[in-house]
Amino acid sequence: MFKCIPIFKGCNRQVEFVDKRHCSLPQVPEEILRYSRTLEELFLDANHIRDLPKNFFRLHRLRKLGLSDNEIGRLPPDIQNFENLVELDVSRNDIPDIPDDIKHLQSLQVADFSSNPIPKLPSGFSQLKNLTVLGLNDMSLTTLPADFGSLTQLESLELRENLLKHLPETISQLTKLKRLDLGDNEIEDLPPYLGYLPGLHELWLDHNQLQRLPPELGLLTKLTYLDVSENRLEELPNEISGLVSLTDLDLAQNLLEALPDGIAKLSRLTILKLDQNRLQRLNDTLGNCENMQELILTENFLSELPASIGQMTKLNNLNVDRNALEYLPLEIGQCANLGVLSLRDNKLKKLPPELGNCTVLHVLDVSGNQLLYLPYSLVNLQLKAVWLSENQSQPLLTFQPDTDAETGEQVLSCYLLPQQEYQPITPARDLESDSEPFEEREPSRTVVKFSEEATQEKETPFVRQNTPHPKDLKAKAQKLKVERSRNEEHANLVTLPEENGTKLAETPTETRTIANNHQQQPHPVQQPIVGVNSKQPVVVGVVTPTTTTVAPTGVQGGSEGASSTANNVKAATAAVVAELAATVGGSDEVQDDDEQEDEFESDRRVGFQVEGEDDDFYKRPPKLHRRDTPHHLKNKRVQHLTDKQASEILANALASQERNDTTPQHSLSGKVTSPIEEEEQLEVEQEQQQQQQQHPFDSSLSPISAGKTAEASTDPDNLDGVTELRLEQYEIHIERTAAGLGLSIAGGKGSTPFKGDDDGIFISRVTEAGPADLAGLKVGDKVIKVNGIVVVDADHYQAVQVLKACGAVLVLVVQREVTRLIGHPVFSEDGSVSQISVETRPLVADAPPAASISHERYIPAPIEIVPQQQHLQQQQQQPIQQVAPTHSYSGNVFATPTAAQTVQPAVSAAPNGLLLNGREAPLSYIQLHTTLIRDQIGQGLGFSIAGGKGSPPFKDDCDGIFISRITEGGLAYRDGKIMVGDRVMAINGNDMTEAHHDAAVACLTEPQRFVRLVLQREYRGPLEPPTSPRSPAVLNSLSPSGYLANRPANFSRSVVEVEQPYKYNTLATTTPTPKPTVPASISNNNNTLPSSKTNGFATAAAATIDSSTGQPVPAPRRTNSVPMGDGDIGAGSTTSGDSGEAQPSSLRPLTSDDFQAMIPAHFLSGGSQHQVHVARPNEVGVSAVTVNVNKPQPDLPMFPAAPTELGRVTETITKSTFTETVMTRITDNQLAEPLISEEVVLPKNQGSLGFSIIGGTDHSCVPFGTREPGIFISHIVPGGIASKCGKLRMGDRILKVNEADVSKATHQDAVLELLKPGDEIKLTIQHDPLPPGFQEVLLSKAEGERLGMHIKGGLNGQRGNPADPSDEGVFVSKINSVGAARRDGRLKVGMRLLEVNGHSLLGASHQDAVNVLRNAGNEIQLVVCKGYDKSNLIHSIGQAGGMSTGFNSSASCSGGSRQGSRASETGSELSQSQSVSSLDHEEDERLRQDFDVFASQKPDAQQPTGPSVLAAAAAMVHGASSPTPPAATSNITPLPTAAAVASADLTAPDTPATQTVALIHAEQQAHQQQQQTQLAPLGQEKSTQEKVLEIVRAADAFTTVPPKSPSEHHEQDKIQKTTTVVISKHTLDTNPTTPTTPAAPLSIAGAESANSAGAPSPAVPASTPGSAPVLPAVAVQTQTQTTSTEKDEEEESQLQSTPASRDGAEEQQEEVRAKPTPTKVPKSVSDKKRFFESAMEDQHKPTQKTDKVFSFLSKDEVEKLRQEEERKIATLRRDKNSRLLDAANDNIDKDAAQQRTKSNSNSSSGDDNDDSDQEEGIARGDSVDNAALGHFDDAEDMRNPLDEIEAVFRS
């Protein structure tokens, strides 16, 4: 009995999504079957389910079903019950066949049946017309159905791993197919009709038996990927040249012997794989594929490469392993981007010297060849690996320069050259132990030593020698080179780059600071030896063991650090040695990571003597560290080459020191090494430097110069001394769009480096015109941070994951190399370089002058940056603020540096907070606010937390609560704002800064649907807001009254303002400080009165008013904010956003009052905030009140203007009390594709042109050209000239006709231009985008089935678009619950009909549209587009729940609570007002036109307080042109009912149905008002002022305006309507002494007067004479112009001529009921008494609650029956009224004739006869009156069933 108590979890759950993947379920859980009414997505993948129960197929609402990776053995036919299924995945099961009943799943779009033993597809499978993605991999299919081409919507078809041999011919009908996978089948012949798939992008044909390709394959012009590997192809068709879009071509493992010439025309080809074929030569034109990046030619029979290979300038990877190459073409040096060249196992004997021009080559594999030496030009390359032998242990060897004996050329050699065949190592060598000391093993080694007497080297041919030890080889080489250098002249001169060609300092890298903490053992300074070899590039220096310690110098370490170190050394020789030792020199020992604890070990330097051998040199134990040989593709650092900039700085410092030396004994060293040796020596030192700089740049200001990364060069080797290469740092904001970010990355730890030996993350590709390109990102930028996360040391996959989880806005911090012009060389008289003139840029700390301050930009930051050091920032920026412009917006404006602006030195405090005296940037924080919405109570949020009190800390020295894990696909993952490492500051308003872990878990697991999180993210960067390319270029000032200056505190886009941090602390410690003195001239909020403080919060004053709108400024949610005022701020002062006081800000939940204050005033009044001015003149006798009722201002949206930047922007306003109400606007801006224009020539001598036009400057062109009107093609006749042309379509804009511009022409002028005589007509058209929602709908009606929809609109009909009264289109106004339209499901209420079976409805009348649809037959081809949104209209009138933005948010009508449920599905609530013509029966139903969509609620007779008669009359006046707010004036004292009816009849439209409805409404309201008035006590009578105000409210109904189109908010003309209310006092006297009552004039339309307008209001007869109440008679005079018919005037004259000689009280009571004739039936005293007693009893009876009546009728049928009853009753009553009036007129005529006859015959008759005649006439009149009342009672009786139906409908 208690199972349905709501506290139980399983009761009434609205479950829509269930995910039970990987749960080891043996069967479908039973609880899932309980959700049959709500469940839409069910995932049961990866379980052990064998059978599907019968009840499982009752889940009729399922849209997505996942059953993959189970053990299902049968798919029952009951699967046809899933009519709404869109996605089905049953792959990896044991299903033997697919039931034929699957054809009933007409909504299925994605299906996967892969990995099931299914031998064939069912015959009905081809009826799944909506399938777009179909997976049939790994099945046993041998054939496909012959009608497989019927799946015309297919975009992806996978048939891999089947047994297919043939394809059906109908497959060519799959015109939308983009991806076709036929790999791993048994296809021998590819059918030619496969080339007729115009949209194909990817084609997989690998692992088949193909021997040839059809020539028709060249027709696939959009094909980008073609894989035909592992087939038997012997040749390719030359038509392959037609694949102009092809980028990837895989021809591996075939039998090709030659390539067709057409392959050279594939200009977009980037990857070509031809390995394992039989190619003997390549085409000479293959080089025309200029975009080639990867060319694989492994295992062929090639003996040479074509010379055109040099044209492939983008080639990155060339692999020609295992061929028969004998030489390389010289043009190989033109491949500037070649990075990997593999020539293994060929017959090469030499390499061309031009190979040295491939500057980015880093891997060269020439093992297995016959090379004698390597070209000397390889020293210019930054090689990481040179493979010369199979058994090579290190990727890069030490090479020695040598001379070729035959040619005399300078070459490189090593111990593996000349190349020989591979010889295995002897076993004895393998047994040698590496653990024993080197000194002990050295005597047992076989070492080749060179004798020292061989001082002169002879030119000898290359002879293979035993490999010497590297130490001995180095000593010998140094000795030989130094001996040779002694004979050179000018040994101590520094040569120009033209003389020695030094290529040392050209490696672009960032400057690094060297920190050496190890003390070196002092050693005797060796005698320096001078030596320079002009034939070889050298580095001159002295190797001297001295103590050198280079301290870190921040970013500008480099040469400054080296120079400062050199100055500390006394001897100039030692200075040179120190520099060389610290930065460049011959260091053989630098500590690794695992050896850093060895701090006191001496750092020894090795120097070589020239005079004689030093025994101590050989006794010194060398520190050789064993390293594993890295693979050349695994990005293991092979050799750390010298950084180009580091080399520049060191060489410049050395040369500068040499030129500045004046002491004679300072001579140069004789150490001469090759650049490769030097780079090898620097390897380990640079590793140490990189370890010391974990985060070289942590700033995010854009642009940020990384200091002087390359100091001004003073050496001629540095690019002639005129430029420098520096690294600048930028922060770039990219907003993600639906197409992605438009960028690709490369590199990372463990991946092939993108640039040089840098294993960082680089931007490898930027999509043109994509988000990244528009944001300013460039290829080659190195990514430092992604949304605050450092990715310097991340691997590639980690970087990809960070980018995926970045959310909607991506904030990248990148480094970019920039070349700067810095100076020029100055030559002295002797021709030497005496000085380098460098433009010095002093880095001063003073603020720049006002003229150099850069432009200010308003940057909407994507996230809220809350720096801790904001006070420090204000102090640093104080000088700049003093000279800033007066109107600067300091909240989010920063200054970008201009050319005149300078940067401070690194040793001072930088204003941007990058580096302060060499320290890291200050730590800032990002405040994030997000709300996670559960789909159901109890659902997980998709993230885990760690930390908190009582739990192990997540971060050191912090016991806060942090996000530790985010579940992929969960709520947090889909939200996109939360990241791992974020600190949780608050959960649903609960402070979490000092909370326990269990408390946070309890808050997160509470049964609440909305979980509001406040997060804090660390942000190391500048204190200013970052730049954004989305921002406007220049924003000099902001209006103080504008939106940005007064925007609500909790309004947020994806970008929010910069605010100060608020901490979650108690308010008791808050101490107010005195206000700083702020001049009034710089105050921004001039209208704000001083506010007071209460409990630390600033309470907003009541007089806070926006100066521009006069509306209250929203209450602030937080007290402190960035100062928004203009002008400078005093030193040391801190300003608050409200009162200028500095205090810790606190967070409090947004209360209902705060939210109410943020809503604009015009929303509170429902759009009817009128300014009513009441002028009271001096009251003399009669009180007159003049009321000016202004036309209301149109509703303005609460949001600002929609953003115009690219990407998706979500704007929300959230009201949080016990529930949460959210208003959201999503703007998704995308780049518009350029419109295509072309010229079309049509012949005019063959008849009609076959198309129609619409539009012009004087005609509407809706729905085309909504933004720019013009002339458009509205219809194309099938089979006509325009249709046969094939270039024209509906919606094309006509720009010119025979060179005559018609873009601004009127409609008639355009027609005349088209009709001008001539043999042909030349049209210039523009293919404008089709209207939104444009589609073709084919409806098929079954026999006897109804179409089931209604239409509205068209010419000469009522307007069809309630949002735009000027729209003349035809719209779908209603979809019935049964019929073809409902069954099809594509037609929706509000759609615009464009064509029906080829008949255009643009410009058609309503009746024509109805006739076309009724005569369309069973097959109806409709062309529709989007019209208006029905749900938006319901929401706009405040009836759809949520936050109303419509016209009547304060008063509601009956039925308003229902219009969000079923009404939104069928449109039945709107149907009564929108539907004009039903298309299913022939009778004309246009009489059912109602007033307007906004007046769809009818007055309910059962309401205790119904709408007043005046409001109803206002509705009659406006008809269908202005909405009447329902129940807006429900308390107005009623007027005499006859006056109201008269006004309704006078002003209602001419349609009989409208008059009838108006009469019925007036009768209902009059009857109701009569009861209320008669039962009202006298003591409740209202004052005159109250009545006047109620009349004014009623008059508002006359000024309400219909809304414009939702997309347009035009400024409407302000119409002022004047209503004059004349109040006259009358005394009601129960004694009928006066035969007539004086009537105050009632003028409606200022022309006609109505009878009884001045009659007193009905009241209860007074019990005592003399106590009659005094009631005003009110006359309303308006300026509204209406028309009346002659019939109305006749009836009015008849009403006025009726005698009124009865009792006043009786007249008041009977006047309400006797509407057809004004004659009254006298009542006796007993009748009056009984009526009065019954009325008093009814007053005291309790109102009975209407029971809910069950009805089998649907809402549509009840509505139809109701309207038919109303129409019949109105028609019957009108006919009876006419007959009664005719009968009364006939009786009067007969009496007059008889009287004349009697008077003629009996002229002497007395007064008695006359009296009898008069009495007889009165009796006849009374009988007519009685008859009229009787008929009227009959009509009222007929309305009883209508009231019962209405009661059922209301319930």
From Swiss-Prot:
Repeat (LRR) residue spans along the chain: 38-59, 61-82, 84-105, 107-128, 130-152, 153-174, 176-197, 199-220, 222-243, 245-267, 268-289, 291-312, 314-335, 337-358, 360-382, 383-403
PROSITE patterns in UniProt: LRR, PDZ
Locations listed in the record: Cytoplasm; Apicolateral cell membrane; Cell junction, Septate junction
Biased composition (Acidic residues): 589-601, 676-686, 1807-1816
Sequence ranges assigned to domain PDZ in this UniProt record: 731-818, 929-1019, 1239-1329, 1336-1428
Extent of Basic residues compositional bias: 620-639
Biased composition, class Basic and acidic residues, residue ranges: 438-461, 1725-1751, 1831-1851
GO MF: protein kinase binding
Membrane topology recorded in Swiss-Prot or TrEMBL: Peripheral membrane protein
Tissue: During germ band extension, expression of isoform A occurs predominantly in neuroblasts derived from the neuro-ectoderm and later is restricted to CNS neurons and pole cells. Isoform C is strongly expressed in PNS and a subset of CNS neurons. In the adult, expressed in third antennal segment and maxillary palps, major olfactory organs and in Johnstons organ in the second antennal segment. Expression is also observed in cortical regions of the brain. Isoforms expressed in epithelia are coexpressed with dlg1 throughout development.
Low complexity composition-biased segments: 1468-1478, 1647-1669
Coiled coil: 471-492, 677-693, 1753-1790
Main localisation: cytoplasm
Bias-annotated ranges (Polar residues): 656-672, 1080-1097, 1132-1149, 1448-1467
Protein's job: Required for polarization of the embryonic, imaginal disk and follicular epithelia. Specifically restricts apical membrane determinants to the apical cell surface; acts to exclude crb from the basolateral domain and define adherens junction position. Regulates cellular growth and differentiation; acts as a tumor suppressor. Essential for odor guided behavior.
Name of the protein in its database record: Protein lap4
Species of origin: Drosophila melanogaster
